[in-house]
Amino acid sequence: MILTSISVLKDNYVWILYNDNCSCIIIDPGVSEDIIKKIEKKNWKLIAILLTHNHIDHVGGVEEIIRRYPNVTVFGPEETKTRNVNKIVKQGDVIKLLKSEIHVFLTPGHTLGHVSYYLKPYIFCGDTLFSGGCGRVFKNKFFDMYQSINFIKSLPKKTILCCSHEYTLSNLNFAMSILPFDKKIKKYYKKIKKHISQNKTSLPVSLETEKKINIFLRTNEKTIKKAMGLKKDTSSFEVFILLRKEKDDF
């Protein structure tokens, strides 16, 4: 299985998996036109669409795509059922496509029913975890988001994160405002800034890298607590809440 992506809208990524037989799967098509053009140009056969959650920049292209390719199966969580989904997925489901198994994990926090799809080594985590950051928390579900990103953190270190937005520089800027002397974050920021200036992307990224530069995956560290003026016994969850609220206002 080969991974590629299309940049759409302002900063979204649509992820595409395809095989040697030119069959493909797309994840979170926020638009239709660019995706259809790509499929036609590559002469791919679209087999399935996977949706992580019900925000328009992730589902906006579904209707037009299935109008063009009516035999496509659309998978998504319960919250996406009005988006032409014909296969509702839930925690623990295993989707068998293109001779591969795709595991479904409930990763709420950004939305109540947000899911992620795991096809080793890739995790398509939508708006749950970003490079250098995490998604906004709606409906005050901070513990849900905390659990979700820590679940992703628990995956094998060689896991490849396929996030849905190019927010990396902004996230690293925030991280440096918290930890201005962190050499790993500063070095990675310079690397990604150069990539972006060359019209390259920062994604996908390994979980191994994220554990080093993503402060939302480091909320148990004494250095972060000290930098934020918190007591040593402040819980990782409390640190996460404070970080996420500060990022909202950054």
Swiss-Prot record:
GO terms for biological process: methylglyoxal catabolic process to D-lactate via S-lactoyl-glutathione. Its EC number is 3.1.2.6. Pathway: Secondary metabolite metabolism; methylglyoxal degradation; (R)-lactate from methylglyoxal: step 2/2. GO terms for molecular function: hydroxyacylglutathione hydrolase activity; metal ion binding. Coiled coil: none annotated. Its cofactor is Zn(2+). Binds 2 Zn(2+) ions per subunit. Pfam families: HAGH_C (PF16123), Lactamase_B (PF00753). Belongs to the metallo-beta-lactamase superfamily. Glyoxalase II family. Thiolesterase that catalyzes the hydrolysis of S-D-lactoyl-glutathione to form glutathione and D-lactic acid. Monomer. This is Hydroxyacylglutathione hydrolase.
